[in-house]
Amino acid sequence: MSIGSHSFSPGGPNGIIRSQSFAGFSGLQERRSRCNSFIENSSALKKPQAKVKKMHNLGHKNSTTPKEPQPKRMEEVYRALKNGLDEYLEVHQTELDKLTAQLKDMRRNSRLGVLYDLDKQIKAVERYMRRLEFHISKVDELYEAYCIQRRLCDGASKMKQAFAMSPASKAARESLTEINRSYKEYTENMCTIEAELENLLGEFCIKMKGLAGFARLCPGDQYEIFMRYGRQRWKLKGKIEVNGKQSWDGEEMVFLPLIVGLISIKVTEVKGLATHILVGSVTCETKDLFAARPQVVAVDINDLGTIKLNLEITWYPFDVEDLTPSTANVSKASALQRRMSMYSQGTPETPTFKDHSFFSNLPDDVFENGTAATEKRPLSFTFGDLPYEDRVPPANPAEPSSAHVSSSPDITTAATQHRALKSSESSSPDCSSSDSCGDAVPEPKDLPSPGEAVVTGNKVTPRARSEVCQKPSNAGSDRVFIEANVPVSLLQDTDEGSELKPVELDTYEGNITKQLVKRLTSAEVPGTPERLPCEGSISGESEGYKSYLDGSIEEALQGLLLALEPHKEQYKEFQDLDQEVMHLDDILKVSTFSESTTLKDI
């Protein structure tokens, strides 16, 4: 920040005006260089703070375009803006590289929640960088159009001078009229482009750090500071307290940058109700404030430099007035979350998480399963194909509430356990051999199909065990029903199954949420032999499925709960999904305990 040309100091009662120079600095450039020595760049990147209210009564940006273009000033502001945007891009590219390296180091020995949070931070920085690049392209496009209009305007101006010096004639007058019309059009276009570029300058966040006056400031002194930037105003009052402390009625203000316009600062000492002594008034340049890092500025208020105004000025390349405000936490995670919420609009080619519902990214048959969208159906998740698995087909295929073990099992939560048990008992015939069923001819729908495990009460007949060993599964069936009559091989409880295991996901394949859903719907079952061993009992079959149960169902449910945790408070769909997943986990534990008890009874 540099100081303007005029500075005012009060005169004494004898009319003597204090000298305008100090230590040989009498010219404008010398005074500017003297004040530039107080500009310091912060060594660390300061994260965005919570915004304060703006001067809404002054209008958003400039409602009117300037009447006269300022091409030289426009070029200076464009160069400063371009350098600031490039610096912003470099800073965030460095931050992105650091986060990416951190993700590579943590992805092998971290849990899903840590990786998911780090992936969200990386995605937020990437979206912010894409918006910066899009912003830079818009600025360049506007400046190129401005240069074209400037050349046309210069050409029209030279032609107007040439026709004015030529002999007067009717054709010359007509040509001069046409040239004047074109010159006016080009001038208006330049003013319009200046106004459009002014809307892309972002905002200056000015934070009050207090006055520094050495022995000049005494306890009890009161000061008024008035800042004017175009049509924007900021007036604040402060008092010097004991032990060098200062209290001000305002600490932070947001100014919208202007192409033509300097910041004017006036400091007044309040002596009484109607006694105000002007300490000094300065004008500050703003083109040096387009920087990625906060700048601590010390402005000389008087000519001797005995009173300085300390300000911390931070430039944000985007105007975030109408976006979601953030909290005042300045930690790294909070800053990244704020940035993600602030810049969630994105560019046209950059869709964000808020623009798409979580359920719209899933296949249509995951939740609807081919039925109409308006039909109420139980929520289910499909795990991978289990090619050589025994199944228990339903005894009554016309009954929609019945379910069976298949090669693509679903965990269904709609039907209650007493209804399922009643359905299974009614569908199972009360005969275990052809001799006991010779007198009664059952209905075709009551006949058990091949490979069916006949269940009576809580006991499994030998016929069911023999057919389990003889008949391989058919890959056409696709349901598993978590009830008391499910084979123990799918629900055998082990000590290892109660432990949570980290889920390995590839961070280079896109959104982790999509990978998690893909993990739930993909075939990730370890290969099994072509035919299950027949010499063992049902408990022997459970060994082949123990790893599948431990590594797929429990792991997937816990991983899904971790993935839903950050978003279930914001989206109602996630709250319902979280409740369904917890219900699934409870049913799985109850069913596992029930089947373990049944196995002991057998």
From Swiss-Prot:
The keyword Cell membrane applies. Residues 46-73, 384-474 are annotated as: Disordered. Residues 83-112 form a coiled coil. Residues 403-416 have a biased composition (Polar residues). Keywords: Cell adhesion, Cell membrane, Cell projection, Chemotaxis, Coiled coil, Cytoplasm, Cytoskeleton, Differentiation, Hearing, Membrane, Myogenesis, Signal transduction inhibitor. The keyword Cytoplasm applies. One of its GO terms (biological process) is positive regulation of myoblast fusion. GO terms for cellular component: apical plasma membrane; cytoplasm; cytoskeleton; filopodium; stereocilium; stereocilium membrane. Residues 173-421 are annotated as: Necessary for interaction with NCAM and myoblast protrusion formation. GO terms for molecular function: 14-3-3 protein binding. It comes from the Eukaryota. It is found in: Cytoplasm; Cytoplasm, Cytoskeleton; Cell projection, Filopodium; Apical cell membrane. InterPro entries: FAM65_N, RIPOR3. Residues 423-437 have a biased composition (Low complexity). Disulfide bonds: none annotated. Pfam families: PL48 (PF15903). Residues 48-59 have a biased composition (Basic residues). Transmembrane segments: none annotated. Homooligomer; homooligomerization is regulated by RHOC and leads to the formation of concatemers through the association of N- and C-termini. Interacts with NCAM. Belongs to the RIPOR family. Acts as an inhibitor of the small GTPase RHOA and plays several roles in the regulation of myoblast and hair cell differentiation, lymphocyte T proliferation and neutrophil polarization. Plays a role in fetal mononuclear myoblast differentiation by promoting filopodia and myotube formation. Maintains naive T lymphocytes in a quiescent state and prevents chemokine-induced T lymphocyte responses, such as cell adhesion, polarization and migration. Involved also in the regulation of neutrophil polarization, chemotaxis and adhesion. This is Rho family-interacting cell polarization regulator 2. It comes from Gallus gallus (Chicken).
